[in-house]
From Swiss-Prot:
Protein name, UniProt field: Phosphoribosyl-AMP cyclohydrolase
DNA-binding is among the record's keywords: no
Gene Ontology cellular component annotations, sorted alphabetically: cytoplasm
Pathway(s) it belongs to: Amino-acid biosynthesis; L-histidine biosynthesis; L-histidine from 5-phospho-alpha-D-ribose 1-diphosphate: step 3/9
Its EC number(s): 3.5.4.19
Primary site of residence: cytoplasm
UniProt remark on cofactor binding: Binds 1 Mg(2+) ion per subunit.
Subcellular locations according to the entry: Cytoplasm
Native source species: Bordetella avium (strain 197N)
Gene expressing this chain: hisI
GO biological process: L-histidine biosynthetic process
Function, in words: Catalyzes the hydrolysis of the adenine ring of phosphoribosyl-AMP.
The family this protein is said to belong to: Belongs to the PRA-CH family.
Coiled coil: none
């Protein structure tokens, strides 16, 4: 007998048992980051109201903010029309979601056209990462 919640049956995980998860600021709509979740991290997120992801590089649960203090309180979980992407509407503690010390991981914008285009940093570092991760 499974202890998995009934709603989990609607979630489509990939062959590795993962689903992409987009974290969005619940107040202003800014996209903060994209990460991955597995069944365990999604269930823990839903149960606790705190964002928990799956770290593909470390192969373990990543409780957002456990090292940096920049946890995400989840206001709402949404599932897309195909059931294969999760959207988390969150409050970002400390206003920093990115390991680079920025509010969002999407801090570079493509400027220019075609062959002359280049990625330009458009958002400032709010806190030196060396002061965040000790």
């Amino acid at each position: 007998m499974s202890t998995e919640p009934d709603w989990m049956a609607d979630v489509v995980f990939d062959a590795d048992g993962l689903i992409p998860a987009i974290a969005q600021d619940a107040e202003n709509g800014q996209i903060l980051m994209v990460a991955w979740m597995n069944r365990e991290s999604l269930a823990e997120t839903a149960a606790t109201g705190r964002a928990v992801y799956w770290s593909r590089s470390r192969k373990k649960l990543w409780r957002k903010g456990e090292e940096s203090g920049h946890a995400q309180q989840v206001h709402e979980l949404r599932l897309d029309c195909d059931g294969d992407v999760i959207l988390l509407k969150v409050h970002q503690n400390g206003g920093i979601a990115c390991h680079t010390g920025r509010a969002s991981c999407f801090y570079r914008r493509l400027d220019g056209t075609s062959q002359r285009a280049a990625w330009v940093t458009v958002d400032p570092v709010l806190k030196d990462p060396e002061l965040i991760y000790k």
